Amino acid sequence: MLSGLWSSILALLGVFLQSVGEFRAETQEQDVEIVQKYLKNYYNSDKRNSGLVVEILKQFFGLKVTGKPDAETLVMKQSTCGVPDVGEYVLTPGNPRWENTHLTYRIENYTPDLVSPLTFTKVSEGQADIMISFVRGDHRDKYPFDGPGGNLAHASQPGPGIGGDAHFDEYERWTKNFQDYNLYRVAAHELGHSLGLSHSTDIGALMYPTYLRGDVQLSQDDIDGPSGNPVQPRGPQTPQVCDSKLTFDAITTVRGELMFFKMRTNRFYPEVELGLQAAYEMADRDEVRFFKGNKYWAVSGQDVLYGYPKDIHSSFGFPTGVAHECWSYDEYKQSMDTGYADEFPGDAVFQKFFHGTRQYQFDLKTKRILTLQKANSWFNCRKN
């Protein structure tokens, strides 16, 4: 059952939304510049202590701590919430909370991106507890917006003055679907701040600071946080990479990066079903294809291409029962290879096959299994 505070958030969010309708860096120098700009914008940090702050940030985001900018640290490039990840936002005794239980709000203006506003009850003039507005650049709260992408919105913790106010960057294109930025999802997150919630370190939580596509779903961390009682941070609820029982749903390269998929893939690809079984990249088309059962999806970036999912039988010519057989499909000829078992294609030295917690290294020339390893050996785990 949802806590009372989350019920308040969802109720306030519903009224608000009715009123408005529904690469990674190429050089190390660019990486450093991105990190320094991020720290300056959100943490008032100079170059002298930036290494320490990077370590703290990476611990918060669940990344490997090195104190140096790297590909993992570049999560900073993603669109994000503008509230700094500092301790005073945690719901613990002594931190600000609304003293009264009946809160008023007022929407100062509307974004023209979403049409057909509906009738709702609001404070039409004067000062409300929660003032909601769409603004650009410097809007006199010491946290100017930075244009399209980057800082999407921010909200103040409960208190007098601007306390509880939520500001949305009008330079963004707000939508009611998953093109650009979904207003419902961002508003739900920001109104959580307006009611006193902190950021969560659980990547599956609504209160995780980085914007992720997908339907609004409350994680256990979201539900536990607003209970009103001091709670210890739950931390990321992601699988432990060195767990000896760890398995993967799918593995493939994506734009030069090796990607391991496990559960929650709809956080990045909201139109792709959970429970993937296989994936591969077509780099020359900038597409990744995901397979589940007899269906597959073609994805570019985070968007599923038009007309997908499709059926593997009609598209590739798979028989109705594949079972334990191995097949090769020629993307250029758009047909299955013939004589596949005798003429294994490819020019790699070997290929790896994953099944459960194991990975098999297959030699293309001898057509034999060379080694058997744990599937998570890619993560420098000790033997377990």
Curated annotation (Swiss-Prot):
It is found in: Secreted, Extracellular space, Extracellular matrix. PROSITE patterns: HEMOPEXIN_2, ZINC_PROTEASE. Zn(2+) 2 binds at C81, H189, H193, H199. Ca(2+) 2 binds at D129, G161, G163, D165. Can be activated without removal of the activation peptide. The keyword Ion transport does not apply. Ca(2+) 3 binds at D146, G147, G149, N151, D169, E172. Residues 218-239 are annotated as: Disordered. SUPFAM superfamilies: Hemopexin-like domain, Metalloproteases ('zincins'), catalytic domain, PGBD-like. Zn(2+) 1 binds at H139, D141, H154, H167. It catalyses: Cleavage of the triple helix of collagen at about three-quarters of the length of the molecule from the N-terminus, at 775-Gly-|-Ile-776 in the alpha1(I) chain. Cleaves synthetic substrates and alpha-macroglobulins at bonds where P1' is a hydrophobic residue. Hemopexin repeats lie at residues 273-319, 333-381. A motif (Cysteine switch) lies at residues 79-86. Its EC number is 3.4.24.7. Its cofactor is Ca(2+); Zn(2+). Gene3D superfamilies: Collagenase (Catalytic Domain), Hemopexin-like domain. Ca(2+) 4 binds at D249, Q277, D347. The active site is at E190. It holds the Pfam family Peptidase_M10. PANTHER family: INTERSTITIAL COLLAGENASE, MATRIX METALLOPROTEINASE. This is Interstitial collagenase. It comes from Aquarana catesbeiana (American bullfrog). The lineage of its organism: Eukaryota, Metazoa, Chordata, Craniata, Vertebrata.
